[in-house]
């Protein structure tokens, strides 16, 4: 089928077993990622909080990014993927949601909120890394004395500039594959959430790219940075590279939707791109950071030869 959407009801064209296999294939990586991110947040902010105090601005912003990923994965594992790939519950649960629309009224805007919040978090962390390397320590501390609060406020409130039209608009159920997903009917026609989300993504890409170019140039010329400082910057450069590649894929796929060249394949690719946004950053961080990896997996020597504390 070229287009899997329907407004009439649950589709009978999709085999239950095959749809359930699609779900299981995704849960294989979604659930371990959910557990990994949960443990990373616990280690950074609770169990070994003191180890991350020296670079607390970076780690606070990164924890917010992890928390947004965690919430995205929670929604995907326990709600969105189930409604999409479990045809057995399609009729009963879609009927329940239509009879109790408050759940969609809350969860659908939150889905966009979490994704936009990650874009703002990415920009904030990239800017923090640039200023850390560009400015003198006293200037850096003076700027981030209030800059951290400003970034936290932006991460919390900027997403509302995207989701406001969803909040005031009527939501409905649109049937995909053997299940369904929520959608909305614009109350303000000129404000397309997807188009503005694409704009925010491009702004996030520009800030991330510029910040990392400046950071890379400084590290290339400077020999004064400590080994630990350079390590954290290399890790964030790798995370930013992954982010930019995923963002390019996101922009390309959404441009295809604007051209009405939409298909089941594009729909699934968009899902996998969002999975990449949520999962690859913590995987890169845990892979490149030996000390954090030891602490998360409760290995011996987690506090020895610490590589995450930066002067």
Curated annotation (Swiss-Prot):
Q: One Pfam family of this protein, by short name? A: Srg
InterPro entries this protein is in?
A: 7TM_GPCR_serpentine_rcpt_Srg, Nematode_SR-like
Principal localisation: membrane
Q: How does it sit in the membrane?
A: Multi-pass membrane protein
Q: Where in the cell is it found?
A: Membrane
**Some GO term, biological process aspect, for this entry: which one?**
sensory perception of chemical stimulus
- The domain of life is Eukaryota
Sorted alphabetically, the keyword list is:
Membrane, Transmembrane, Transmembrane helix
Q: Where are the transmembrane segments?
A: 24-44, 58-78, 101-121, 148-168, 200-220, 235-255, 266-286
Q: Name one GO cellular component term.
A: membrane
A molecular function annotated in GO for this UniProt entry is: transmembrane signaling receptor activity
Q: Which family does it belong to?
A: Belongs to the nematode receptor-like protein srg family.
Q: Would you tell me the protein name for this molecule? A: Serpentine receptor class gamma-6
Gene from which this protein is expressed? srg-6
């Amino acid at each position: 089928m070229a287009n899997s959407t329907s407004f009439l009801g649950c589709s009978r064209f999709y085999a239950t077993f095959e749809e359930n296999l699609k779900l299981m294939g995704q849960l294989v990586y979604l659930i371990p990622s959910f557990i990994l991110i949960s443990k990373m947040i616990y280690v950074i902010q609770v169990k070994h909080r003191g180890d991350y105090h020296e670079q607390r601005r970076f780690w606070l912003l990164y924890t917010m990014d992890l928390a947004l990923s965690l919430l995205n994965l929670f929604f995907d594992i326990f709600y969105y993927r189930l409604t999409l790939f479990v045809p057995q519950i399609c009729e009963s649960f879609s009927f329940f949601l239509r009879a109790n629309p408050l759940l969609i009224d809350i969860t659908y805007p939150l889905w966009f909120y979490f994704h936009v919040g990650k874009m703002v978090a990415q920009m904030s962390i990239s800017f923090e890394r640039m200023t850390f390397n560009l400015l003198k320590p006293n200037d850096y501390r003076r700027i981030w004395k209030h800059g951290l609060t400003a970034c936290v406020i932006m991460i919390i409130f900027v997403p509302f500039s995207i989701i406001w039209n969803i909040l005031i608009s009527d939501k409905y159920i649109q049937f995909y594959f053997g299940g369904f997903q929520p959608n909305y009917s614009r109350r303000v026609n000129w404000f397309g959430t997807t188009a503005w989300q694409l704009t925010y993504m491009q702004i996030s890409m520009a800030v991330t790219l510029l910040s990392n170019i400046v950071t890379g140039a400084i590290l290339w010329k400077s020999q004064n940075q400590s080994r630990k400082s350079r390590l954290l910057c290399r890790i964030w450069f790798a995370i930013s590279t992954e982010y930019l590649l995923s963002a390019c894929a996101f922009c390309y796929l959404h441009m295809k939707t604007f051209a009405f060249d939409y298909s089941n394949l594009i729909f699934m690719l968009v899902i996998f791109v969002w999975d990449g946004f949520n999962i690859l950053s913590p995987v890169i961080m845990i892979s490149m950071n030996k000390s954090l990896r030891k602490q998360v997996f409760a290995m011996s020597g987690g506090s020895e030869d610490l590589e995450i504390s930066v002067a």
